[in-house]
Amino acid sequence: MIQQESRLRVADNSGAKELLCIRVLGGSKRRYGNIGDVIVATVKSATPGGVVKKGKVVKAVIVRSKQGVRRNDGSYISFDENAAVIIKDDKTPVGTRIFGPVARELRDNEFMKIVSLAPEVL
């Protein structure tokens, strides 16, 4: 469950290391985001020489969440950390690699490029 001021790790090689959530997109009263939701965030720390610089406002999709998500068969999946992948306006990732596992729910939200780049889909 991601809300305003939540900090997330970046799971790609765009150059950013940590994000701070500014807003969860999808309605004016929307407070919380989970796996597959798009957020607006700012880059809090970045690696030198990366594509994304510190302080830049970006869009990102949540790929891992400690809260977890319920599946249709009744099972739950949760992760050890909150992580996101920085995306462009056309829902393609800025980076060329994805680190760590991602949830299968991204496939339902038309993030097939992220799913195909991920080393493991749970």
Swiss-Prot record:
GO molecular function, one term: large ribosomal subunit rRNA binding
GO cellular component: cytosolic large ribosomal subunit
Pfam families: Ribosomal_L14
Keyword RNA-binding assigned: yes
SUPFAM superfamilies in the record: Ribosomal protein L14
GO BP field: translation
Name the record gives this protein: Large ribosomal subunit protein uL14
Species annotation: Clostridioides difficile (strain 630) (Peptoclostridium difficile)
